[in-house]
Each structure stands twice: as C-alpha cells, then as structure tokens.
Regions:
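Short, cationic low-complexity segments
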Residues: 207-216
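Conserved beta-strand signature within the Rossmann-like core of class I S-adenosyl-L-methionine
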Residues: 86-88, 111-128
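Short "lid" loop at the C-terminus of a central beta-strand within the Rossmann-like core
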Residues: 94, 124-130, 149-152
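A short acidic, Gly/Pro-enriched loop at the edge of an enzyme's catalytic core
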Residues: 74-87
Length: 216
C-alpha cells in the first residue's frame, strides 16, 4: 500500500543510502512483492534518471526518458507500445497535456493490429479543466466518464498561500472545497476513457465500486 511505501522511504535505515545502495535494496523489496501475474508496464517520463531507476528496480519492462510535450516519440517507444491496453499517468495532468496524450494514443493505435486506441485512466486535480482531453480522446473513439462517488487526496498544500490560491480557483469554477481542499489537500477526480465498442454498460462508479477502489 501507499502507507507501506511512506513508512519505507521515511525510515532511518534508508535515509543515508546512496542512489546505488537504495537501488540494491529496492530491487529485492519489489521483487518479493510482485503479483503472481503482474501487468507488463512500459513507462515514459521526461526525467530520464527516474526511468532508469524504475528499470533498475524491476518496476518497468521497458522505459523511455522522453518528453512528448516537446518532441515526437522515438521509434523504440512506438515499437514498445503495440500491446498496450491501458494508458495512465501517475500525476501532473495539466503539465502532461494534449500533445503528450495525442502522441501516446496515436503511437499505440498505429502499433496495434486493430488500430484501436487503448483505455485511459487519469487522476487530475479537481481544478484541472478536463474537457480538452475528453474532446481529444473522443477523436480516438473513446468515451470518457468521471467517477462521481468520491475524490482522491493527492498531496498536502505546501503553505497557506498555495491553499488560498487553489480555493480561489475552485470558487471560480463553482466547486465546493468543503471536506476536501479546505482540509489542506489537493483532491483529484478519476476519469476513465474506453473505446466506444468496449464501454461497459455499467457506470464508472459501478466498475470501480466492484473492484473495492472506492473503499480505499
């Protein structure tokens, strides 16, 4: 769980390790916790050192230090994504924007024999206007739903000034921060985009409710 990771990386035992020593400790840590049938993950990030670390720790099958906001995907990336069924982002929707998603969806669709775009699941902060991405996904034949049952705490505000800035933005969008941002945390919405021909008759709330995600 995330709590396990917070405890691990805040522990005194790891505090003074070099990058190489931490990597040597992380490799067996994650190997011993892998699911019996884990998904194969292709990762991309503009921070090439982060990608190298994830590869070294055994968290990625393939990784690419590329910035799709400023450059086109490499041929190696295009070749790696032919079997991708789900695109997700670990944070930063808003920094990672239309150009990146357009590049990635195009690369996957062109690499797949059926030419179809993959599913997309994201967790942008509530103050992000998601409509431009939803419109982009629609052009790839994807239907987008937003989870309505709950939001997800993302990170604490760094200070009162950041909190006040976000509250003003939310007020301008007509969003109620009570129990969410008012408590000192960014909150994120969950969006799921599916190919129209694969979209379940169940709502996104029903899909994720059955998985237990809404209880986390």
């Amino acid at each position: 769980t995330l709590d396990d990771l917070y405890a691990r990386y805040a522990s005194p035992e790891l505090a003074d390790l070099s990058t190489e020593e931490l990597l040597a400790a992380d490799r067996p840590f994650y190997a011993g916790r892998r699911h019996p049938s884990p998904p194969e993950i292709v990762g991309a990030d503009s921070a090439a050192n982060a990608v190298r670390y994830a590869l070294g720790a055994g968290l990625l099958e393939e990784g690419f230090g590329e910035n799709f906001e400023t450059t086109d995907p490499s041929e190696a990336f295009r070749e790696a994504v032919g079997d991708v069924g789900l695109v997700t982002v670990t944070g930063g929707v808003g920094y990672v924007w239309e150009r990146t998603f357009d590049h990635v969806l195009k690369a996957v669709a062109e690499a797949r024999p059926d030419g179809r775009a993959p599913w997309v699941a994201t967790l942008p902060a509530r103050l992000v206007d998601y409509e431009p991405l939803s419109d982009l996904f629609s052009g790839y034949g994807l239907v987008t739903q937003k989870l309505s049952a709950r939001t997800f705490p993302q990170r604490r505000f760094t200070d009162a000034a950041e909190r006040d800035h976000v509250l003003r933005q939310l007020a301008g969008m007509g969003l109620d921060p009570a129990g969410k941002e008012e408590e000192g945390w960014y909150h994120a919405d969950l969006y799921l985009s599916q190919p129209a021909g694969e979209a379940s008759k169940a709502s996104v709330d029903e899909l994720f409710g059955a998985s237990g995600l809404l209880d986390y």
